[in-house]
Amino acid sequence: MPGLKRILTVTILALWLPHPGNAQQQCTNGFDLDRQSGQCLDIDECRTIPEACRGDMMCVNQNGGYLCIPRTNPVYRGPYSNPYSTSYSGPYPAAAPPVPASNYPTISRPLVCRFGYQMDEGNQCVDVDECATDSHQCNPTQICINTEGGYTCSCTDGYWLLEGQCLDIDECRYGYCQQLCANVPGSYSCTCNPGFTLNDDGRSCQDVNECETENPCVQTCVNTYGSFICRCDPGYELEEDGIHCSDMDECSFSEFLCQHECVNQPGSYFCSCPPGYVLLDDNRSCQDINECEHRNHTCTSLQTCYNLQGGFKCIDPISCEEPYLLIGENRCMCPAEHTSCRDQPFTILYRDMDVVSGRSVPADIFQMQATTRYPGAYYIFQIKSGNEGREFYMRQTGPISATLVMTRPIKGPRDIQLDLEMITVNTVINFRGSSVIRLRIYVSQYPF
């Protein structure tokens, strides 16, 4: 049978296909060199390789290799003639019998190299670079990588092999970047959010300390993770842009911040007092300066210095009107023997007092009392003059006393003179007389 003879011839030649290097001392894959006989003997892979064929496949040894065929495949068992065997029954040609080494001392003619190799000028089998000779079958999307005796088809970085095609790997799906990821064909790029900078590893992000690099704040910069905040010095407030600071007008917050006047200044404020006052240690309250005590007044030697809240008064000596006579430093008396004194108050006593502007009301401001109580006498207290605005009234607090009450707040500066009359009535001796306290009230300009 010519077909089987050709197969046998190829099988015999396979025993002597030269391996790269020395062809006389090595055998091709699938054969072992018998050191005693110097022959290449076939390896039965079906016995030496565990589970050479799996599943429903069975292993069939052949010269230089083995086959895996389905167990249900029909097996050919026809006649086969072998020049080295008188009888053979099997699905494949039997292995060639050992050939005596003495019959093949050397190989003196060019031989056929294994697949993936070619004979060079020195009759050596060298690797064929299929990638360089463009004799590979890699897909255009793949790259060819030459190997010893063959080649492999692979994909470049950023691609993976799927059904013979190199498809782009979406690295962004796997969290390669710490913050922002942008996929590109065959690769990816990482970026960072505002306030961060990309590290040298190209993946992680580092916070940018804006306060050190650019310091965008007008006053104080505080670095935060991924950003920064601006703070203002005391007395300033942050504007809507979050960067600039503007002066805070503390005086507009409350009218009670200072007792008198609040003066705003950049980043702060201070309280001031009007003339005649000094600022206390609390830096907000004003205290009257007693010009009379400190002799810081302009009164003459004949005048009396009377201190007021925020100022002073120079009071002239009392001058009694006719027919009154001066009987003391501040008292005038009308003589009883004088006929015009019968319908006049017996005495006029001068008194001075001061009140602050806008004092809260009602307020008891002055007390009047009889110095002597006579048997059978009673006393009547009234405001004889000066109360045209009905800002005061007399409230009798006892048989011989009464209190002057301020009923309306009075705004200063203003000077008021009231004649407070005490009428004495004695029914026992049928007597009626009166005395007057001439009260001069000085209302200051300020409510303190």
From Swiss-Prot:
Q: Which Pfam families match?
A: cEGF, EGF_CA, Fibulin_C
PROSITE patterns for the chain:
ASX_HYDROXYL (PS00010), EGF_2 (PS01186), EGF_3 (PS50026), EGF_CA (PS01187)
Q: Which residues form the EGF-like domain?
A: 42-82, 127-167, 168-206, 207-246, 247-287, 288-333
- Hey, what's the signal peptide range on this chain? 1-23
Keywords attached to this Swiss-Prot or TrEMBL record, sorted alphabetically, are:
Calcium, Cell adhesion, Disulfide bond, EGF-like domain, Extracellular matrix, Glycoprotein, Repeat, Secreted, Signal
Question: Where are glycans found on this sequence?
Answer: N283, N296
Quote the InterPro entries the UniProt record gives: cEGF, ECM_structural_protein, EGF-like_Ca-bd_dom, EGF-like_dom, EGF-type_Asp/Asn_hydroxyl_site, EGF_Ca-bd_CS, Fibulin_C, Growth_fac_rcpt_cys_sf
One biological-process term from Gene Ontology?
negative regulation of transcription by RNA polymerase II
Q: Give the location in the cell.
A: Secreted; Secreted, Extracellular space, Extracellular matrix
For this protein, what post-translational modification is recorded in UniProt? N-glycosylated.
The UniProt annotation puts motif Cell attachment site at 54-56
The record's GO molecular-function terms, alphabetically, read: calcium ion binding; integrin binding; protein homodimerization activity
Give the disulfide map.
C46-C59, C53-C68, C131-C144, C138-C153, C155-C166, C172-C181, C177-C190, C192-C205, C211-C221, C217-C230, C232-C245, C251-C262, C258-C271, C273-C286, C292-C305, C299-C314, C320-C332
Q: How does it assemble?
A: Homodimer. Monomer, homodimerizes in presence of Ca(2+). Interacts with ELN. Interacts (via N-terminus) with the integrins ITGAV/ITGB3, ITGAV/ITGB5 and ITGA9/ITGB1. Interacts with FBN1 (via N-terminal domain). Forms a ternary complex with ELN and FBN1. Interacts with EFEMP2 with moderate affinity. Interacts with LOXL1.
Q: Which purpose does this protein serve, as stated in its record? A: Essential for elastic fiber formation, is involved in the assembly of continuous elastin (ELN) polymer and promotes the interaction of microfibrils and ELN. Stabilizes and organizes elastic fibers in the skin, lung and vasculature. Promotes adhesion of endothelial cells through interaction of integrins and the RGD motif. Vascular ligand for integrin receptors which may play a role in vascular development and remodeling. May act as an adapter that mediates the interaction between FBN1 and ELN.
Name of the protein in its database record: Fibulin-5
Source organism of this protein record: Mus musculus (Mouse)
**Record lineage:** Eukaryota, Metazoa, Chordata, Craniata, Vertebrata
